[in-house]
Amino acid sequence: MVISDQRFRPKDKTEYLAWLEQNEQAMLAQFIESKGKLTTELKGLKDRLQEMNRQSQDLLQPYYQAQRRYFEHLYYNDRDTWIVLDPVISVHPDEIFFECFSEDESSYGKLSCSHNVFTNVGEKACGTTNIDYSDGLYQEFQKIRSYKRTTLAIDPGGFAVKTGDDAGFDEKKIDLPESWVRGFLQVSSAMTLPMASVQLHPMDVHNICFLLRRRKERVGPRSLRYLLTPGEPVRVTLDPWNIEIVCARSIYSGPEPRQIRVWGRRRLHILERLIPVARGFTLHLLGDGMPSFYVAELGDMSFTLGLSGWTANDWSRLGNFDLLAPRGNVDEFTLRRVYTALAENWCESAPSLARRLHTDEAVVKSALAVYSQKGQVLYDLAGGVYRIRELSREPLPLEQLRFSSEREAKADNFINAKLVKVESQERTAEGVRIAGSVLDNAVKYQASIVVDDDQRLRDAGCECFFWKQNRLRKGPCEHMLALRRAS
């Protein structure tokens, strides 16, 4: 202890500085001499690289030619395979937004960019177009940097992007595949359904993704369980390891406790690149095995990730959430009046439209739901407003799109044949509970539904096999739909 001295003493660099002063000129001359040698070596390496690139191009040319012939064959003989849910670009008075689906059609993404993001906004006209998201366009997006000037050009014929002094890339508009349209219709309808919402801190999303990266499940279940208790931190349990993450920064403020289980959790890795720049995430949950939406707040931008109930349950074929949307009887005059009022501002909330038109809010929501199912209106989950978004200049083939599932067609048949009997209607805290029976192939099925004040289906039950197997994860059965129509 007597000789112990832990005080900080800076290094004495006097000798080093003196040596550096004596040898500085010699070192500088040596550096200049080596620079010329390195420049010569670099030129030789560049020449070799160019020669190797030429040889590689010659070797791969037969492959590229065969690939081109294959894509041309798909284009002319199997157009649906050639086109896979490509992005939609919409220009609005307040923002530009891009929408797309994943290749397996189970994930939906929407990037909204306020006009404040851009230094200069030229002459613009509001509208929607769609393009083919090719590899060339993807590579051009990867060049975007904060220190480079990026130019976006959008017109009805396509989309162009140019970064810095690089040559720009122009992607042309393509035709709309049927599954592409149906996927957007289902997403628009799902966004209008009742949800449990919670604010998540970016580090909480990071912790979920981090644990999923560290572990790989070899047996089921492969689910995330969100445990929501009012006034307490959100808890997330990862199955099958039963690991619980306490999101201390994220407090649930909902009215009642909820436990919601979702699958297809590895799709959350899509959000990883946004975690460092996100100010927060808003999570919207519909229910067990139902879709979930993650909204990343990025300042003047926002990104919405919509996940179907599980990976195999894609948006365009197995999700029938348009059948759960508000279905109030709205006359044609009111429909056109609501749509015209929305088109005046291009985006507006349902309460604001109702006040402006002196109309009941439930009627406005039902009218907007009709246009959502027609592909003319989109619900913006991040802003809480409805937006004009025409998927096609021509009227969509709604009969083909609407009856991709036979359940609603069967429900229409039950109504037309007068096989539906409404036995009771009573008001509850959740809404109106309707009970009745449907005669299907000489078998009487008892069914019941609960419809809230916005005409949305909140709960339902039936005696049929479809409901016992799927509950509401694939939408209501034909007996519930018929009962709702008859009431």
Residue ranges, per PLM feature:
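Long, low-complexity, compositionally biased intrinsically disordered regions
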Residues: M1-S487
